[in-house]
Swiss-Prot record:
The modification Phosphothreonine is found at residue 320. Mn(2+) 2 binds at residues 64, 92, 124, 173, 248. The modification N-acetylserine is found at residue 2. Mn(2+) 1 binds at residues 64, 66, 92. Its EC number is 3.1.3.16. Residues 306-330 are annotated as: Disordered. GO terms for molecular function: iron ion binding; phosphatase activity; protein serine/threonine phosphatase activity; RNA polymerase II CTD heptapeptide repeat S5 phosphatase activity; transition metal ion binding. This is Serine/threonine-protein phosphatase PP1-alpha catalytic subunit. One of its GO terms (biological process) is RNA polymerase II promoter clearance. SMART domains: PP2Ac. It catalyses: O-phospho-L-seryl-[protein] + H2O = L-seryl-[protein] + phosphate; O-phospho-L-threonyl-[protein] + H2O = L-threonyl-[protein] + phosphate. It comes from the Eukaryota.
């Protein structure tokens, strides 16, 4: 039996999208074999494509989703369901939210169906030691079994780490690394791989910008570093880039600039965990590399679910809890 016979993608995507318009929280229970098939086939595609993706605009870039499946559906309603728009997601698909399984399954299904138009980077939560603690393991165990969680781990270990859009926009989940001198260093990272506790791969998934730091600083998460505006400016100049686009931190308006608009943080899970009153955002990059932001307001708030937003509100920036915090978030 061929892969396409084993994996009825259109049926899988159809069932995942059937709950659009239902009360948020309604589950979609794919079969275990279907999910295993999604993991195996997507892993094959990830490994066949570069670890440092070279992408072309136009595309839409999204930050953390964290199992907020109904908000992911709203993002697609707003931005256009694939293949209407090209997408790059910056990682953190699982953990914290209630529906990590639906979230990751839809994303993997779209990756398989549109491999040249739909791209997923690895976040720090696409790592067994993290999603063992923050919810994904428990969701897999409750709804399926631990073996399936291990199958997801195999797929996550093959995800690409960074992307460059039209040679000008550098994208990753976390941020820069003091070890990063050449893009070739990223290309040399061998997959499949776990996320180490330190070094280049760790930093790309874990580091954070900090306006109060000059150069490199300690990170409150207990892992990786923080970096200042000058680090950003030097990196962009050295590599002839215009912008760093990253995720990894809750920001009040769904997007937030840093270092004179040389770096932008995107966060795409509105009303994160039901605890923050943040908006979610995605960044549209057009053919001329002009960036605009589409905003998802917290669903239960304002009458308008969507809004175009161009102003800035620096706001406070709550950070996701540190890696070495052993408390799972229920």
């Amino acid at each position: 039996m061929s892969d396409s016979e084993k994996l009825n993608l259109d049926s899988i995507i159809g069932r995942l999208l059937e709950v659009q318009g239902s009360r948020p929280g309604k589950n979609v229970q794919l079969t275990e074999n279907e999910i295993r098939g999604l993991c195996l086939k997507s892993r094959e595609i990830f490994l066949s494509q570069p670890i440092l993706l070279e992408l072309e605009a136009p595309l839409k870039i999204c930050g953390d989703i964290h199992g907020q499946y109904y908000d992911l559906l709203r993002l697609f309603e707003y931005g256009g369901f694939p293949p209407e728009s090209n997408y790059l997601f910056l990682g953190d698909y699982v953990d914290r939210g209630k529906q990590s399984l639906e979230t990751i399954c839809l994303l993997l299904a779209y990756k398989i169906k549109y491999p040249e138009n739909f791209f997923l980077l690895r976040g720090n939560h696409e790592c067994a030691s993290i999603n063992r603690i923050y919810g994904f393991y428990d969701e897999c165990k409750r709804r399926y079994n631990i073996k399936l969680w291990k199958t997801f781990t195999d797929x996550f270990n093959x995800l690409p780490i960074a992307a460059i859009v039209d040679e000008k926009i550098f994208c990753c989940h976390g941020g820069l690394s003091p070890d990063l001198q050449s893009m070739e260093q990223i290309r040399r990272i061998m997959r499949p791989t776990d996320v180490p506790d330190q070094g280049l791969l760790c930093d790309l998934l874990w580091s954070d910008p900090d306006k109060d730091v000059q150069g490199w600083g300690e990170n409150d998460r207990g892992v990786s570093f923080t970096f200042g505006a000058e680090v950003v400016a030097k990196f962009l100049h050295k590599h002839d880039l215009d912008l760093i686009c990253r995720a990894h931190q809750v920001v009040e308006d769904g997007y937030e600039f840093f270092a004179k608009r040389q770096l932008v943080t995107l966060f795409s899970a509105p009303n994160y965990c039901g605890e923050f009153d943040n908006a979610g955002a995605m960044m549209s990059v057009d053919e001329t590399l002009m960036c605009s932001f589409q905003i998802l307001k917290p669903a239960d708030k304002n009458k308008g679910k969507y809004g175009q937003f161009s102003g800035l509100n620096p706001g406070g920036r709550p950070i996701t809890p540190p890696r070495n915090s052993a408390k799972a978030k229920k």
